[in-house]
Design a protein with these regions (language model features):
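Sec-dependent N-terminal signal peptides
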Residues: 4-14
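N-terminal amphipathic, basic helical "cap/leader" segment at the start of enzyme domains
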Residues: 21-101, 107
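Small-aliphatic-rich amphipathic alpha-helix that forms the alpha element of a beta-alpha
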Residues: 55-61, 103, 116-158
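A short coil-to-beta-strand element that immediately follows conserved catalytic motifs
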Residues: 70, 141-145, 169
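A glycine-rich helix N-cap at a beta->alpha junction
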Residues: 94-99, 159-186
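Acidic, glycine-rich active-site loops and adjacent beta-strand->loop/helix elements
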Residues: 107-110, 148-152, 180
């Protein structure tokens, strides 16, 4: 009986310790979620492109997907001339002109679910995009989701611009860099 009581006490203390840790992590995560904002102007400050893009892509690919299909492709662009041309071509992505990095999140239709559930690729790639945006913010970087799909005109234009095969469908362009200013999140509640 004494061993059982000691076990319950230890279990309770251990559980309380975990609850405290989980609560702390939860509060930190909620802070990142609530303070993230769309950043459209970037400072002329360098970033460690390889390290940053690796971390952002790791976060993106940790997203859940329907049937674990992972129907995504990520195109990383670091060439400022290409980003500037894209920013002029895609007015909703003018933030590319000052970004140090851009990631284009695409759906790979060869990896997507077949049949009536095919469009789940949009949700899968959207979840990956949100993970990427939150990770960028947690690293002190700014980013903005510039929509491409479902606009047929934008989708076809970007496919042509990047010479993408027909099965790769761009969902969005995400310009990334050090924010030029402190951007406050919009009131949403």
């Amino acid at each position: 009986m004494k061993k059982y009581i000691v076990f319950l006490i230890l279990t309770g203390l251990f559980g309380f310790g975990l609850m405290g840790q989980n609560e702390k992590v939860g509060k930190e995560l909620m802070k990142v979620i609530k303070t993230r904002a769309s950043v459209r102007q970037f400072a002329d400050k360098p970033i460690e492109v390889e390290k940053v893009s690796h971390m952002l892509l790791d976060a993106a690919m940790a997203a859940p997907t329907a049937m674990n299909k992972q129907p995504w492709e990520f195109i990383v662009i670091t060439d400022s001339e290409i980003m500037e041309k894209m920013g002029k071509e895609f007015k909703n992505a003018s933030a590319l002109s000052t970004a140090k990095l851009a990631i284009i999140v695409c759906g790979n239709m060869k990896e997507a679910i077949e049949g009536e559930s095919r469009e789940f690729w949009v949700q899968d790639c959207s979840a990956a995009t949100e993970n990427l945006l939150l990770m960028a913010h947690s690293m002190g970087l700014g980013a903005v989701w510039c929509g491409i799909y479902p606009s047929k005109e934008r989708t076809e234009l970007l496919q042509k611009f990047l010479n993408l095969p027909e099965n790769i469908v761009p969902l969005n362009i995400i310009p990334i860099g050090v924010p030029a200013d402190n951007v406050a999140p919009k009131e949403k509640f």
